[in-house]
Amino acid sequence: MSLQAIKFDRQKTRLDILDQLLIPYQTKYIQVSNIDDGYSVIQKMQVRGAPAIAIVGSFSITCELNSVKDGQKNNHGYDVSDLSVFKAALEKRIDYLIKSRPTAVNLVNACTAIKAIVETACTIDDLYAEVLRYSVVLFEDDLKNNYRIGANGVRYIDNELSNFEGPFAVMTICNTGSLATSGHGTALGIIRSLWAKSKANPRNADDKTIQGQKSWLSHVYACETRPYNQGSRLTSYELNFEKIPFSLITDNMPAYLIDSLFSQRVNCPLPSRAPVKFIIVGADRIVTNGDLANKIGTFQLALIASQYDGVKFIGAAPTTTIDYTRDSGDDIVIEQRPANELTSILGGQVDSSDQFVTDSEGKVNLLRIKTATPNIDVWNPAFDVTPNRLIDSIVTEQDYLVKDSHGKFNL
């Protein structure tokens, strides 16, 4: 990708994040100087994706420590002359940061790890150095792990397709790519890795054979992902940039699309005739029994997949997303988002020829449009929980996991 979602300058201890609310209309970076800034960009979803949230949260703590460790700034009760008071103030600030997005476990895990560093630090300088080191390693490890997730996902898919020949399609929801992580992505990382393998011996995607491969990825279906439209704004941006063949669909189209492809319905024009063989999603939290919390709409995709023997449902996430403190999905706190996020939409203004309208600086004019009846009741959960019985595989950087003979994941 030409765009980095997260930029951290270690020499200057400076963090800048790409404002993802403006993509694909504008490219704008926001400086995150402290925990308040980190809370704001996470809560407003200017940065999103469980791994990215954890990384930005960790770096925001690092930046705040850098500004207070030498007494340059003394807000929020920091006292550089008293280590115990300093630590207590920092722990209170970290607890505040955790509340920005309660469902994503990666942020909680990262903050918990940093609090352990706080507890054992002997000096403020040592504390800063260790938090900086932890944050940088978190960022670097996430990128390495994403490539491993991609490779493990391809291994699982190859095994499942051992008796299948020809082109196939996959479906995904939300955005789980470079914009949601340090790079490559989780679920979208698997799709990237699949596409890299499929185009190794380029042919027409609908040819009967590709040299050396019995089956190959030929098409991706990206769900729009209402109400924040991460699929239409972000995933479509990434797929388009990498020239991976894809079609954008609304969140209420998957059942009819999959059924039409399986039945080869001739009276229904389709972007590709390759059947959907896998639905690949990310996760904001996976609990001990394998239940998976992800973007709202994921559960219904798993239900659809369960109706077709030939469609496998895959959850992809690093092991940092696994929450061993909760036994089942019933224990997951589901974040509720503001009503106006469902009843209005932000987009780029277009003219009569469907071209973007720009200002004198060449920036696309952004407009917020009301799309619903005013003053109505709204239910707007950000996530849902997919029960483990509907999940065929959980792919991590360590391996791909399938259920044992008792129908359980051994996480």
UniProtKB/Swiss-Prot annotation:
GO terms for cellular component: cytoplasm; nucleus. SUPFAM superfamilies: NagB/RpiA/CoA transferase-like. Coiled coil: none annotated. Pathway: Amino-acid biosynthesis; L-methionine biosynthesis via salvage pathway; L-methionine from S-methyl-5-thio-alpha-D-ribose 1-phosphate: step 1/6. The record marks 174 as: Transition state stabilizer. InterPro entries: IF-2B-related, IF-M1Pi, IF_2B-like_C, Initiation_fac_2B_a/b/d, M1Pi_N, NagB/RpiA_transferase-like. GO terms for biological process: L-methionine salvage from methylthioadenosine. Its main location: cytoplasm. The active site is at 284 (proton donor). It is found in: Cytoplasm; Nucleus. GO terms for molecular function: S-methyl-5-thioribose-1-phosphate isomerase activity. Keywords: Amino-acid biosynthesis, Cytoplasm, Isomerase, Methionine biosynthesis, Nucleus. Its EC number is 5.3.1.23. It catalyses: 5-(methylsulfanyl)-alpha-D-ribose 1-phosphate = 5-(methylsulfanyl)-D-ribulose 1-phosphate. It comes from the Eukaryota. Belongs to the eIF-2B alpha/beta/delta subunits family. MtnA subfamily. NCBIfam families: eIF-2B_rel (TIGR00524), PRK05720.1 (NF004326), salvage_mtnA (TIGR00512). Catalyzes the interconversion of methylthioribose-1-phosphate (MTR-1-P) into methylthioribulose-1-phosphate (MTRu-1-P). This is Methylthioribose-1-phosphate isomerase. It comes from Komagataella phaffii (strain GS115 / ATCC 20864) (Yeast). The gene is MRI1.
